[in-house]
Amino acid sequence: MKPATGLWVWVSLLVAAGTVQPSDSQSVCAGTENKLSSLSDLEQQYRALRKYYENCEVVMGNLEITSIEHNRDLSFLRSVREVTGYVLVALNQFRYLPLENLRIIRGTKLYEDRYALAIFLNYRKDGNFGLQELGLKNLTEILNGGVYVDQNKFLCYADTIHWQDIVRNPWPSNLTLVSTNGSSGCGRCHKSCTGRCWGPTENHCQTLTRTVCAEQCDGRCYGPYVSDCCHRECAGGCSGPKDTDCFACMNFNDSGACVTQCPQTFVYNPTTFQLEHNFNAKYTYGAFCVKKCPHNFVVDSSSCVRACPSSKMEVEENGIKMCKPCTDICPKACDGIGTGSLMSAQTVDSSNIDKFINCTKINGNLIFLVTGIHGDPYNAIEAIDPEKLNVFRTVREITGFLNIQSWPPNMTDFSVFSNLVTIGGRVLYSGLSLLILKQQGITSLQFQSLKEISAGNIYITDNSNLCYYHTINWTTLFSTINQRIVIRDNRKAENCTAEGMVCNHLCSSDGCWGPGPDQCLSCRRFSRGRICIESCNLYDGEFREFENGSICVECDPQCEKMEDGLLTCHGPGPDNCTKCSHFKDGPNCVEKCPDGLQGANSFIFKYADPDRECHPCHPNCTQGCNGPTSHDCIYYPWTGHSTLPQHARTPLIAAGVIGGLFILVIVGLTFAVYVRRKSIKKKRALRRFLETELVEPLTPSGTAPNQAQLRILKETELKRVKVLGSGAFGTVYKGIWVPEGETVKIPVAIKILNETTGPKANVEFMDEALIMASMDHPHLVRLLGVCLSPTIQLVTQLMPHGCLLEYVHEHKDNIGSQLLLNWCVQIAKGMMYLEERRLVHRDLAARNVLVKSPNHVKITDFGLARLLEGDEKEYNADGGKMPIKWMALECIHYRKFTHQSDVWSYGVTIWELMTFGGKPYDGIPTREIPDLLEKGERLPQPPICTIDVYMVMVKCWMIDADSRPKFKELAAEFSRMARDPQRYLVIQGDDRMKLPSPNDSKFFQNLLDEEDLEDMMDAEEYLVPQAFNIPPPIYTSRARIDSNRSEIGHSPPPAYTPMSGNQFVYRDGGFAAEQGVSVPYRAPTSTIPEAPVAQGATAEIFDDSCCNGTLRKPVAPHVQEDSSTQRYSADPTVFAPERSPRGELDEEGYMTPMRDKPKQEYLNPVEENPFVSRRKNGDLQALDNPEYHNASNGPPKAEDEYVNEPLYLNTFANTLGKAEYLKNNILSMPEKAKKAFDNPDYWNHSLPPRSTLQHPDYLQEYSTKYFYKQNGRIRPIVAENPEYLSEFSLKPGTVLPPPPYRHRNTVV
């Protein structure tokens, strides 16, 4: 053992250590490599260890635990599950090693190049402290390396461990366990551990996952049978046979699935026969597949690396740092003369020229003076070796200036700068960026790549032998018009021409830098690279080319060289070859046919035919083939497949097929005889029953009769206005229903069956009518009637604001957290109602939820819904189109639909709401959705959702249907969240957001454009009968409600008498301060049962009536005719009872319930009626919406606008401003009721009744209206949503605590 000596490594690693999060949310931390070195301060040593590994699950490196005292808390190590390097435990004094969740040690690095697990010298020599137990009870895999356990004085049970089961390569040299471990005081393993354990109890038994497996298993297992083998990609054991059941992965973990390799960056497209970019690609980061590398890593091919290799350079593409191969030499920036590390240098000389090796960019200047070229004896600098000047051949840019005042006499040009492209001129030498002075040996410049001199002037003078300079058009190199050229006292042009020092004939008139075709500024005809040529090698030459303008480009290497005057290629790439050199795959020439290339969903194998063209192998060939049929598949012995030749296996296959068919015939005949005998027996029994005149039902189901009524409408009562959309069987119109003999107009939606449909469509259409007529719930669209015209027509309520998907998309900037959570509750309650009636919706989505008002949504489109019989648990669908992206996996694969598959669709619907109309799996083809779901991928977490809301969605998307929550649980969960909306949804500006006015909806405006709203009446207003006028009570303080009144059946709300002089009257969904104004009260006649919710979430929701608008003007009372009371009855088997007189006052001064009224179970919300209710006698005013009007005729005042401010439960309206008035409003709390308010989630007292009001012109039950003071304003409470617990059910004398949460749009 050689202890490391670099103590500084600790400090540097402490600074560099960080934790990143891979895609599967596992915490990853960096390991250490200090071996036995430790800090001198043991306290600091412990703190460093804790800082490294607290909350760490995967250690990317080595886990080293050394020099820890006996009294230290090491419980933070329980989070470690995987170590990629080695585990070292040495020189410690603690008793127990708490690595209880460590499952795998990969051993990518080994201690002493040999051991993956090293445990030694863990005791104190002068004391009784030391390691006694290894808490490695879940360690089942060491992929590489051995185990060393030695010199642990107090260690027990280590010699009982079956290390050969843990170590993948258990060679004897890899296992070192000597007898110096342990003492005589060690106990025995528990009797259930069969002699192998990590500790004394039954929880410390060793789990064997390899040596107990069946011989057919090629890896780990979870039982002794053949069916208990783990997937071959599993490491450390598993809980099932799938690749998602592994405890750890042998190679890579891809979102919970163990795979051989991560999804590659490029996949083979069998349609285009090319490798294409894979949008689902992931990068390997350790043993994980991640969508994005950590910020301090770069992408090299398909892996995350700390730095690019020497042959690649780091570039950034689309925000991703990547390693790209260098075309020639990798970019390298170096300091120039007078900058950075060469700040004190005056010239390039032999002492600093090596600093320019492999430099491509010079940040600064290059200066060549006599003291650098010929040496400086004064400073002991030798003359420069001319060969070393070739280091400048890699330079492509000089940001400053180039100053050459001295040059080796044996060099006649500056060809070492042949790759110089740009002289930046950011720093100038007396205004010059290029200076060449008094170089007598220079004959040509040879700056053949120079394209730009960005700034500064040119000065070339006193070079007596320099030619070619006069042929160059220097202005083409300049970037500004202010640059100047000073060229003089060089060799005369005529002398140069006389000696033949002229440009090559292939150069253009732009000139040249020197002799030869490679020194031209541009070519007269064609160019190949930098060299000008006469013509391209189209038909001859060693390398064949094609012409791309004036540039000759070499053909692809896969093109075969053609003879006899034929072109080898017609353009770039392997798809433009005249003939392929090797093989042809589709239009492309390839070196070999695809053999195991990764495709979109599988690996691609192809074979070559005699014409050297590639063709796909048979689908059964999973490892390659030699021909097109399944007989040509290639099999390998190690795969477990038969290696017999095909002709030898054919007789066996034929015999097996014949034997199988014979057995099938025998089984079929036996089954037919059994069915026939059973049928005969059943007929005989039935005949005996009929002969005895049995009057009892033969098959009583126990199911209650369906007593819903179906209204038959005449075609003359319906008027179509405009088309709203089309469905599977017909078209939906906006229409008007004018009941026969009446003058009211009711806006409806009319669904008409297409005339071309057949009998089956008629049956399914009427089945839909049956389902809709049987459903009666506030959050389900109601069927009004059926018209049996030649084309069947279904008439339903018209939802004025369209579907919820378009509504949230249109108003996404105005929708807050309260409204979103209220919608979630309402949809869950509607689906809970369907589940109680054994109805599977099958097409739940935001597009199939309609908006009656901003606070009220309803589920529609029962076109796919199916009722389950009493003994059915699932529905098996036949053909037809299905909304794949909203469906559970079992629905896609097996077309099995249950209530739990509706829960999956509910999760997707909630995701649509939280993304304000986002498209699920946008951009992913539908056919790829099943594979995506099986791999564990789900919709991402919406930006506004907290982890609490997103986890509810994730639970809805569990593969196991029984693991998904019930709608009853979902309603309770979202009810709880809706009590504190801003805790669960984070929306910018939520506090300042106003609810969108229904009148602003584009869908709503389109509905109102084409129809006069005179005599318009809402459908529910028309159907629900009216009660007698009841003068409303006027009060300002809290009224008393007996909590005993909210039993299974509820009585109508009692009336209350005024309790102060200041009177408030509720009109049209708002309150107005008036004196002595009476408002009619409508008694309910139909009971809509509310499905129960989970314990602790049984409270109703009561919203502020002014949430969506301001106070209303007073409206004159109105009563409809008595005939309307006969229009609808909740129970068609019972006649409407006689109306009883008004209730009487009890002994405490409260109004007693009216007799013979149908009992109500809860209060209906007061909702906006978007249509106008106006009578011809003028007794009602036209209302656009009762919750969106001001109390005054003028424009709304600033103080009347709705603002999102918290409402406090213990603040009340003090209209009199007197102390005694406030005193009357304070309630006292009984002792037994105090505990119920410690946590508002557990308020479980009874609730007040709620009446069914479907028209906003009438008074909401006044027993539920209380007033609170909010910043000096008085606002009423209206039962808008039955999801919030109100304080009504408190007994008299109860004092409410301060509000624990802040709510928007709702008063708790």
Curated annotation (Swiss-Prot):
Motif interval(s): PPxY motif 2: 1053-1056
Renumbered ranges of motif PPxY motif 1: 1032-1035
Motif (Nuclear localization signal): 676-684
Motif PDZ-binding mapped to chain: 1306-1308
Annotated Gene Ontology cellular component terms: basal plasma membrane; basolateral plasma membrane; cytosol; extracellular region; GABA-ergic synapse; glutamatergic synapse; mitochondrial matrix; mitochondrion
Effect upon mutating V675A: Abolishes proteolytic processing and nuclear localization
Record-linked PROSITE patterns: PROTEIN_KINASE_ATP (PS00107), PROTEIN_KINASE_DOM (PS50011), PROTEIN_KINASE_TYR (PS00109)
Location of the protein in the cell: Cell membrane
Residue span(s) of domain Protein kinase: 718-985
Impact noted for substituting L995A: Abolishes APC/C-mediated degradation
EC number(s) from the headed UniProt entry: 2.7.10.1
SMART domains with a match to the protein in the record: FU (SM00261), TyrKc (SM00219)
Glycosylation (residues): N138, N174, N181, N253, N358, N410, N473, N495, N548, N576, N620
Catalysed conversion reaction: L-tyrosyl-[protein] + ATP = O-phospho-L-tyrosyl-[protein] + ADP + H(+)
Residue numbers carrying Phosphotyrosine: Y875, Y1035, Y1056, Y1150, Y1162, Y1188, Y1202, Y1242, Y1258, Y1284
Impact after mutating R927Q: In ALS19; reduces autophosphorylation upon NRG1 stimulation
Family: Belongs to the protein kinase superfamily. Tyr protein kinase family. EGF receptor subfamily.
The protein's assembly and partners: Monomer in the absence of bound ligand. Homodimer or heterodimer with another ERBB family member upon ligand binding, thus forming heterotetramers. Interacts with EGFR and ERBB2. Interacts with CBFA2T3. Interacts with DLG2 (via its PDZ domain), DLG3 (via its PDZ domain), DLG4 (via its PDZ domain) and SNTB2 (via its PDZ domain). Interacts with MUC1. Interacts (via its PPxy motifs) with WWOX. Interacts (via the PPxY motif 3 of isoform JM-A CYT-2) with YAP1 (via the WW domain 1 of isoform 1). Interacts (isoform JM-A CYT-1 and isoform JM-B CYT-1) with WWP1.
Function: Tyrosine-protein kinase that plays an essential role as cell surface receptor for neuregulins and EGF family members and regulates development of the heart, the central nervous system and the mammary gland, gene transcription, cell proliferation, differentiation, migration and apoptosis. Required for normal cardiac muscle differentiation during embryonic development, and for postnatal cardiomyocyte proliferation. Required for normal development of the embryonic central nervous system, especially for normal neural crest cell migration and normal axon guidance.
Protein name: Receptor tyrosine-protein kinase erbB-4
Protein's organism: Homo sapiens
Chain's gene name: ERBB4
